[in-house]
Amino acid sequence: GHGSGVMPSSFRLARQLLSRIEDENTGEILPEWLHTEVTSEMKDTCSQIVKMKGKDLKDFPLLEGVRKQVEDPLDIFITMNLKPSLSVIGADGIPAIHSAGNVLRTNTDLKISIRTPPGLDASLIASKVQKLLEDNPPNGAHVTAEMTEVADGFLSPKLPDPVSDDLEKACREFYGNSSMSLYIGGTIPVMAMLQARYRDSKFIITGAGGPGGN
């Protein structure tokens, strides 16, 4: 504890490194290469979904007085499905509060999860994140970034016109509404794995909106 303020705190250094990826004030992901273009067509579709679902748009429980990072319903939907985000999901080197003493710790280990938008090469992104965290470390600290569980999100290719027309016809006939792309699950790698294995196949994933989606 006597060296506090002279010796760098490993937790402070970890915070500095995370700030290379995320704006700690807003939660916005900083590197441009972690973003992908949200096209006007995507925005229009998302806007239609938000208008259709209204109050049923997915919400999350919050303690009284706590505000979301994003408030506008359209921004919420786009952020959840088409934008990157960072979460700290685990930590080592930090003792439990009941056993913590007033001494500097030798290391802080964090496990982070970075959600990448559909359409990005996750392996390439992982190497860039590793370089971003390890290069020019603050105070000359020894920093190691190990990448695990790297997988692509799924950017659904355009359906053939006959399939799209049949889907539209069926939706109007049975539900009285036009068919829509929801983009939900686009950041989940399962469909990208299937598309990579069956490159000539087209997929229509339904039901993601929940039992009341229709």
What positions do the PLM features span?
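A short glycine-threonine-serine/GTX helix/turn-capping micro-motif
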Residues: G1-M7, H98-G101
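His/Asp/Glu-rich mid-to-C-terminal helical/loop segments that flank catalytic regions of hydrolases
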Residues: G3-L30, K111, S123-K131, G207-N214
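An extended, acidic, His-containing surface patch that forms the Zn2+-binding/catalytic region
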Residues: I29-N107, R115-K128, N136, G140-N214
